Each structure stands twice: as structure tokens, then as C-alpha cells.
């Protein structure tokens, strides 16, 4: 999986550079988020602007990351959702769980 990470203060931004977040690659994202949390970072921002498709495995990894962050008194926030991905969040009502922003800059301002 093509991921780029960028530390911004105490916050880690993960840029997901894949068109799909599904059963074939979601475990890699989960492992990366777990590594980041284990190093002591509490807040992660996921930039999903390149992701055009997400399945239940991808959503499950995001929920797992959200729970992991919450356990550490941190947060997992999302930005850059494309229309199809946003529709999946609305269909599953996960848009009520996550803080979702249009852009990285908008999300960074929320911290």
C-alpha cells in the first residue's frame, strides 16, 4: 500500500495514495496506524482524497483506528472524501462517528 506520513506538531497526517481501500490492502493501513499510536502519537488525520472505493474491510480498519485513538484520548479524523466514499459513510451512518473535513488544511485548523 502506498502511504505517505507527515508529522505536523503532535499530529500525524497519513496520505493514502491508493484508489481502493479494501480487503486487499486495509491491513497495511491498520498496521501503520497501530505503529503510530504505539510510538505515542494520539492524533491521526487520514487524507483519503485519492481513494475512490472503500469496502467493509476498509471501513472496519477506520473504525478500529477510531477506537484505538479514543482509548488513548486522541482522535482519528478524515478528510478529502470523494463522493462514492462519502456515500458509503452516509449509508453506514459512520459520518456521524468521524470528524470529516474537505481538506487537510481545514482539518488541521480543527486541532
Language-model-derived ranges and their functions:
Residues 20-97:
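Amphipathic alpha-helical interaction surfaces in cytosolic regulatory modules
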Residues 83, 105-106:
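Acidic phosphotransfer microenvironment of two-component signaling modules
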Residues 99-103:
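Short acidic-hydrophobic, aromatic-tinged amphipathic segments that line or gate anion-handling sites
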Residues 8, 49, 105:
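Conserved catalytic submotifs in the C-terminal HATPase_c
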Residues 1-14:
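Short beta-strand/loop segment at the start of cytosolic alpha/beta domains
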Residues 16-18:
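Flexible glycine-/small-residue-rich
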Amino acid at each position: 500500500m502506498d502511504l505517505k506520513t507527515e508529522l505536523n506538531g503532535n499530529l500525524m497526517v497519513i496520505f493514502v495514495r491508493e484508489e481502493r481501500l479494501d480487503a486487499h490492502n486495509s491491513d497495511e493501513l491498520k498496521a501503520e496506524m497501530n505503529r503510530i499510536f504505539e510510538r505515542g502519537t494520539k492524533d491521526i488525520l487520514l487524507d483519503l482524497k485519492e481513494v475512490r472505493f472503500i469496502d467493509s474491510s476498509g471501513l472496519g480498519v477506520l473504525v478500529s483506528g477510531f477506537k484505538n485513538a479514543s482509548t488513548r484520548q486522541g482522535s482519528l479524523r478524515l478528510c478529502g472524501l470523494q463522493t462514492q466514499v462519502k456515500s458509503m459513510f452516509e449509508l453506514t451512518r459512520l459520518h456521524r462517528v468521524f470528524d470529516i473535513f474537505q481538506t487537510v488544511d481545514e482539518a488541521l485548523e480543527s486541532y
